[in-house]
Amino acid sequence: PDVAKLANDLKTRQTKSLASGIDVIMADLKESMEAPPTSIDGHTNALVLLYENPRAPHFSEPGTDWIKNADAHRAGLLAAETAIVLANYLRLLGYPSRGHTITSSDVDLGRLAVAAGLATVEEGRLSHPYIGQRFGLAAVTTTFDFNPDRPLAPMRAQPAKAFGAAWRLGTRSVKNASNAVPFAKRRFVDGAHPFENLKRVETPTTYIDEPNVARVPKRTDMFARVQFGDMGKKLQDSARGGHYVRKAAPSMAQRRALGAFVLLQDGDTARKKTRLDPDTAAELVKATSYWLGIDAVGISRCPTWAWYSHDAKGAPIDPPHDQAINMIVDQGYETMEGSSGDDWIAVAQSMRAYLRFSLIGGVVAKQIRNLGYSAKAH
């Protein structure tokens, strides 16, 4: 039913966004939803994706009521994001491709995982040598030709050195025996970083003259100004249709998924409110966000001056929310250092962060709406 609702939204809803090229993206998505199903008979290869889950929440661990027994959903969601983006990427390069997820697949993901050397069958269940059974799967089938990996030998036939000193001490890999299980030594609510060691203050270090902060319309941000020609014709032409994104295949592949998430940023609120005390609510939001993969999350008030005065359509904004959940997605220092600023990495790393937040932020906002409170991902 949710897929049908999204298809109807693509036909009937008008997005309120000044994102460059959003009209092209939405038209493309609408056509995709209306297109008849196609066969994968010509697909000769598969790219299989394995997404590891953290440890299971402890029985009385604070903030974990929303995430208990939801590992399959978490891994399936994150794996689906990557599979859909990579399938789109390969299509942009000219190779017919399709993503297969835990909810919509034309292939047996378990069999593909064994064939691709990601898992073996141990006592009737799929298992990874280092991760065990804490994972979910997705795949991309394609005509793109690449060398396949070989299947793994059963666990009983694996050499002792695979789990020897190098694995225990981490001398040859970032992942090792001491950090193999995410959040093994941390509570989900605390996050992976030791934020509790940082000094906190009552107000921001920078003085903000709140009564006199001017609210400005969405039209004043740089992306909008470029599109409307405020920065000159050359930059306007470079932004037309989202050209600065479309010129690199990886970022354009992510942009299509981002377009679909625009329709999921907001939605109807449940009629019945679930009452939670503020401390419990904060713990639930933080633990869920970290469990889903956000790198840092903080909760703050959302003062009036933080809102634009007018939205993308020019309509006045009466600030609907007085609280905010702020999330950070790490783009990766090595990735940023490896980019010249004018290559396929530069835009793609930003789009990856936008996409990851749109996915996880959208999930958290939806959960809050399910509890009877208005919430929107930005």
Which residues fall in each region the model found?
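Catalytic cores of enzyme domains
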Residues: 2-161, 286, 292-378
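Iron-sulfur (Fe-S) cluster-binding modules
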Residues: 1-20, 24, 40-46, 153-301, ...
